[in-house]
Amino acid sequence: MTNIRKTHPLLKIINSSFVDLPAPSSLSSWWNFGSLLGVCFGVQILTGLFLAMHYTSDTATAFNSVTHICRDVNYGWLLRYLHANGASMFFICLYLHVGRGLYYGSYTYSETWNIGILLLFAVMATAFMGYVLPWGQMSFWGATVITNLLSAIPYIGTDLVQWIWGGFSVDKATLTRFFAFHFLPPFIVTALVMVHLLFLHETGSNNPTGIPSDPDMIHSHPYYTIKDILGFLVMLTALASLVLFSPDLLGDPDNYIPANPLTTPPHIKPEWYFLFAYAILRSIPNKLGGVLALVMSILILAIVPILHMSKQRSMMFRPLSQCLFWLLVAVLFTLTWIGGQPVEHPYIIIGQTASVLYFLIILFLMPMISLVENYLLKW
């Protein structure tokens, strides 16, 4: 008798996507991050749902409702810190996932890559709106500064900002709509993830060598499901350790002060996972130029497939490109550090140098070094 998982209309979709899915036999642990993102996303939706049951999106009570969740709700502190640190874990996995795609040339699957960029923008917008909800000092001033960037858009900028605020400043209307929009995008992200996987399964997975692996495929289950479960355990252990031992390590102390429009924090900054983009924004003295650089720092990923000049797909056998890739990683770490520092010497010049290097490496140096490697292959 034919197995039900291969004949049932619903089960056969799951079967072809996760169980009998052919996968290259050489996938390394860098291919674990897609499934880890799925687990992180599940944790975020569950904890977010329970937090939404107790949270109130009103400027008078928002801060107190978060305090109430931590003090009075059964395991509310656990929900709150799982959600906050789960976002950090989500972005760690996300950046490693994108980095893997850049290193091994997965961006040549352009549909999957472009949906991934859309996902990145959607997740970043969701996380930003979530940061506003506790209504602490950094929430309020972060929302004010970041939304104000839209005023750099010619003609419609100021009207657009006031439309988003729902008034002439960040206030009750802003908080209410940010809560609504923080709750909605995760479901849009879920749909985009399905499209992302649909396009991925059309082409099949890339592998570390970058060479077509059609003659050498294995079943995803049990081989890669076991490997994924190990990844889940490692990541959930790291998340549990962070939540239980040092829940405020990645947060900002200013967010434990209730929002006050009359007092500005000494240094306004977003969450740590946006600091690299924030540093690029601040490194340009012109407002519109800074906003364009901020958007381009992420959107530049969309033109990476066009800039691929190498005859080889993966960087596995391209030592010169590898050096540039790790230089890019170092630049991103530098930008993240600079984004958290005050705007003063020597941080300004370091940030500007790192920002120039970031765009220089992706737009010019990587394509040029690929052409050099192509030339060396002829020898």
From Swiss-Prot:
Short name of one Pfam family: Cytochrome_B
Cysteines paired by S-S bonds: none
Keywords annotated in UniProt: Electron transport, Heme, Iron, Membrane, Metal-binding, Mitochondrion, Mitochondrion inner membrane, Respiratory chain, Transmembrane, Transmembrane helix, Transport, Ubiquinone
Main location: mitochondrion
GO terms assigned for molecular function: metal ion binding; ubiquinol-cytochrome-c reductase activity
Subunit text: The cytochrome bc1 complex contains 11 subunits: 3 respiratory subunits (MT-CYB, CYC1 and UQCRFS1), 2 core proteins (UQCRC1 and UQCRC2) and 6 low-molecular weight proteins (UQCRH/QCR6, UQCRB/QCR7, UQCRQ/QCR8, UQCR10/QCR9, UQCR11/QCR10 and a cleavage product of UQCRFS1). This cytochrome bc1 complex then forms a dimer.
Miscellaneous note of the record: Heme 1 (or BL or b562) is low-potential and absorbs at about 562 nm, and heme 2 (or BH or b566) is high-potential and absorbs at about 566 nm.
Protein name: Cytochrome b
